[in-house]
């Protein structure tokens, strides 16, 4: 079955009930570590936003948001969020955060156009975080420093879970390896972007691929990024090698966010300069929003990774094709 991988000899080491307990342990410990390492305060977050606000994440520009009308407001349309990438920057200003301070939130999203498999679901849950920085801190040094702080939280959580559950073991290396998307293309010119990620992650075990969204020397992009939150020169993905599925597993997408000049440039490159008229983008271009670094960290992804699960549906409750549910059950993989 194309969208279901069954690892040879896989048997879940925990029952469904034991898994639910372990999920909470992972989430509680990682959340505390992340907040401590980055000096973050937890805040409440929206499940839906108004389209005209410009606050929703347009992802690659083709994914359709789930929308509905509010009866009390003459069926005024709102959209379920794809992520909170832009909302967080707006919130930092509204809530009065200063340089060196940040926020994080539990985000739930629906991505109706997602192609599901062992790693992908139409339901997305992640810690969305954002931190205020100065204009002078918009550089590669700040990016790498912040990546290492996030990676330290990942390492701390794996160490904690490995002590709680003997079967887990520690597989993350002490340090994360940095490489740009162009360097990766130069290293494996014959490979697709996903193949490059797999080969390099398998070699280094934990990597951060920088500069995602920009066009490479080949004329292709490593991956898509919306033009109005990450600066494509100062962003990237944390990816680890996951031996259970013999695959590269993205745990986090993050970056230093666009300033006024980067937003103008990237809107033009993406051919969507009309977005400059939306509320969020107008505020940014007008210099009304703080400079920030931020990202999203998949909650189900890291639970799957730490608990050594074969399918993301073992750690989150979602909807899957009937044939996937039946095939998974027949092979001892219980989807929640």
Indicate residue ranges for each PLM-predicted region.
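Class II aminoacyl-tRNA synthetase-like tRNA-binding/catalytic domains
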Residues: 2-120, 128-132
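Generic recognition of stable, solvent-exposed alpha-helical segments in well-folded globular domains
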Residues: 18-25, 29, 138-145, 149, ...
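A generic secondary-structure signal for well-formed alpha-helical elements
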Residues: 34-41, 150-161, 310
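N-terminal pre-domains immediately preceding structured catalytic cores
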Residues: 50-57, 171-179, 321
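A general structural signal for short secondary-structure junctions and capping/turn motifs
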Residues: 68-71, 93-99, 119-121, 169, ...
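Short connector loops at helix/strand junctions that flank enzyme active sites
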Residues: 75, 101, 124, 204, ...
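Extended, charged alpha-beta segments that form solvent-exposed binding/catalytic grooves
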Residues: 105-195
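A translation/RNA-centric and nucleic-acid-associated enzymatic feature enriched
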Residues: 108-110, 181-336
């Amino acid at each position: 079955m194309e969208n279901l991988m069954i690892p040879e000899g896989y048997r879940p080491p925990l029952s469904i009930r034991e898994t639910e307990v372990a999920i909470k342990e992972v989430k509680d410990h990682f959340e505390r570590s992340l907040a401590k390492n980055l000096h973050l305060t937890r805040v409440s977050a929206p499940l839906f936003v108004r389209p005209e606000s410009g606050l929703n994440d347009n992802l690659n520009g083709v994914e359709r948001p789930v929308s509905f009308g509010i009866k009390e407001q003459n069926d005024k349309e709102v959209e379920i969020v794809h992520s909170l990438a832009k909302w967080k920057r707006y919130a930092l200003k509204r809530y009065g955060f200063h340089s060196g301070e940040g926020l994080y939130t539990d985000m739930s999203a629906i991505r109706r156009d997602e192609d599901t498999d062992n790693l992908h679901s139409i339901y997305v849950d992640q810690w969305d975080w954002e931190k205020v920085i100065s204009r002078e801190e918009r550089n590669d040094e700040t990016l790498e420093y912040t990546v290492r702080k996030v990676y330290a939280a990942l390492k701390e959580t794996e160490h904690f879970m490995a002590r709680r559950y003997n079967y887990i073991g520690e597989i993350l290396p002490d340090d994360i390896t940095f490489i740009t998307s162009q360097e990766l293309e130069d290293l494996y010119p014959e490979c697709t972007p996903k193949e490059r990620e797999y080969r390099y992650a398998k070699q280094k075990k934990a990597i951060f691929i920088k500069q995602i969204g920009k066009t490479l020397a080949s004329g292709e992009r490593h991956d898509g990024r919306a033009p109005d939150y990450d600066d494509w020169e100062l962003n990237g993905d944390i990816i680890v090698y996951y031996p259970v599925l013999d695959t590269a597993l993205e745990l986090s997408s993050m970056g230093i966010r666009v300033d006024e000049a980067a937003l103008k440039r990237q809107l033009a490159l993406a051919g969507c300069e009309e977005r400059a008229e939306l509320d969020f983008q107008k505020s940014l271009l007008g210099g009304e929003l703080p400079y920030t670094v931020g990202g999203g960290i998949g909650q189900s992804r890291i639970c799957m990774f730490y608990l050594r699960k074969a399918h993301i549906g073992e750690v989150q409750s979602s909807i899957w094709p009937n044939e996937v549910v039946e095939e998974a059950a027949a092979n001892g993989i219980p989807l929640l």
